[in-house]
From Swiss-Prot:
Species assigned in the record: Haemophilus influenzae (strain ATCC 51907 / DSM 11121 / KW20 / Rd)
InterPro entries: DUF5358
PROSITE patterns to which the protein is assigned, alphabetical: PROKAR_LIPOPROTEIN
Protein known as: Uncharacterized protein HI_0966
Species classification: Bacteria, Pseudomonadati, Pseudomonadota, Gammaproteobacteria, Pasteurellales
Pfam families: DUF5358
Length: 188
């Protein structure tokens, strides 16, 4: 029985090592960081970041990025760096990384290490890309001080009543209903 358990554990350990999931050594300068981003998460982050950048900033060049305004730089860092990382490790751990300089430096080190290895990634779906672009555009406008209501806007007529977009018994065909009403009064 002990032999079967020992052989099973040996097979399990050797099987796990076949998938190259070993964590690379952490450089001494990052020892003691509050959060150490794993290689696996860093790879996922590099891929997700590349997908977002291809979607939201498809024509971005290094020179254009160097001339970003503060607001553009902020939105770029949020959408390309922090939001993809947040989806992978969670908001709580991103806050830990942002609060600790060593963690932030190690995360940057990991990101750069795997970002150079990522060349072609599968693009986001058109629908998710469009949604992401609109969110980034709205957030950029908000950061620049242009207010946009986050609620669904109700279109109103000139008299302040809500506009009915289905075209039934509205101002679009009010004249038609007035003719019917007058005609029925004349017949009676």
């Amino acid at each position: 029985m002990k032999l079967i358990a020992t052989l099973g554990m040996a097979a399990l350990l050797s099987g796990c090592s076949m998938f190259d999931s070993q964590q690379s050594a952490i450089p001494a300068e990052f020892a003691g960081a509050d959060y150490q981003l794993s290689d696996q998460h860093a790879k996922q982050w590099a891929i997700a970041s590349k997908q977002v950048e291809q979607c939201v900033y498809p024509n971005l060049t290094r020179i254009l990025q160097q001339h970003f305004s503060k607001e553009d730089s902020y939105i770029h860092s949020q959408y390309v760096f922090f939001y993809p990382l947040e989806k992978i490790i969670g908001e709580q751990y991103v806050k830990i990384i942002q609060a600790d300089e060593k963690s932030m430096n190690y995360a940057s080190y990991q990101f750069k290490k795997f970002r150079t290895r990522v060349s072609n990634v599968e693009p986001l779906t058109k629908q998710s890309c469009l949604k992401l672009r609109n969110e980034a555009r709205d957030d950029l406008a908000a950061v620049k001080g242009q207010y946009k209501n986050g609620m669904v806007e109700v279109q109103k007529n000139e008299d302040g009543t809500p506009k009915n977009s289905d075209g039934i018994a509205t101002n679009q065909n009010k004249f038609f209903f007035d003719i019917i009403k007058w005609g029925s009064m004349l017949l009676l």
